[in-house]
Regions:
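Multi-pass alpha-helical transmembrane bundles in non-GPCR membrane proteins
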Residues: 1-246
Length: 246
């Protein structure tokens, strides 16, 4: 049946388009204000770390003695490289609303993937049998659920998703005795130190403090610095455990 009110329908569509354009303009102005307020170092730390992580990952995989250790090293290296790269792209670029929203989801979801990616080589190297399978299943299931959580609820409050990151990151406490008996004290110390650095970074991110220089190096840069330090610490730990098998 022909539409009896074509002009009204067209007017409604036109109004909807105008409203959408207005929303996009407002979002653009808000984003520009945020860009102006961001510290100048925002994103540069992870941008500098990404190629170094790639090179370090290639070395780790190349020097891994067997297929199992190469798999663990590759998962660890790729998860770190993706996190640092996406973070740098997200924080340094000026994006349209849709691209910005996508990168934000990707950036936050990558934290879960790095947690699981870090657990992978340590579990393969230091645990055996059922304990290895269970811990990897738990952390990867948690990571996948965490990714879905951040993708479909991008606006979740910081106080909610930050503790979830931390809880998944400390899943190893249930296997501490197995890790103690399965590795050199230096590796265990590096594992724990890296975990503490990530936790400290999570607290800085959650409380947005300390914020030493809002114009140049704010709380987010402190958070990024701690994530880099934690990654380096875990990288050294994985390297020692891997090379001891050569």
């Amino acid at each position: 049946m022909p539409d009896s009110h074509p002009n009204g329908s067209a007017s409604t569509r036109s109004s909807g388009h105008r409203l959408g354009d207005q929303v996009d303009r407002v979002a653009g102005h808000v984003r520009e204000a945020i860009e102006e307020a961001k510290p100048h170092f925002r994103g540069w730390l992870h941008a500098a770390t990404a190629p170094l992580a790639a090179a370090a990952g290639i070395v780790l995989v190349a020097l891994s003695p067997n297929a199992m250790t190469r798999t663990g090293s590759a998962v660890f290296a790729v998860s770190a490289l993706v996190l640092f790269t996406v973070s740098a792209i997200y924080h340094r670029g000026r994006w349209s609303p849709r691209v910005w929203a996508f990168l934000r989801r990707f950036d936050h979801a990558n934290i879960f993937l790095l947690i699981a990616g870090t657990y992978t080589p340590f579990s393969l190297l230091l645990l055996e049998g059922r304990n290895r399978v269970v811990l990897l299943a738990v952390v990867w299931t948690g990571a996948i659920l965490g990714v879905l959580f951040r993708v479909f609820w991008a606006g979740a409050p910081r106080w909610l998703y930050t503790p979830i990151y931390m809880a998944l990151g400390w899943a190893a406490v249930f296997y501490v005795n197995d890790f103690v008996h399965g590795t050199h004290p230096a590796v265990l110390t590096l594992m724990a130190t890296g975990g503490l650095l990530y936790t400290l970074g999570g607290l800085v991110y959650g409380f947005q403090w300390p914020n030493p220089s809002p114009r140049w190096f704010g709380f987010h840069e402190v958070f990024h610095t701690l994530t880099i330090a934690a990654f380096v610490t875990h990288y050294v730990g994985v390297s020692i455990a891997t090379y001891s098998l050569r």
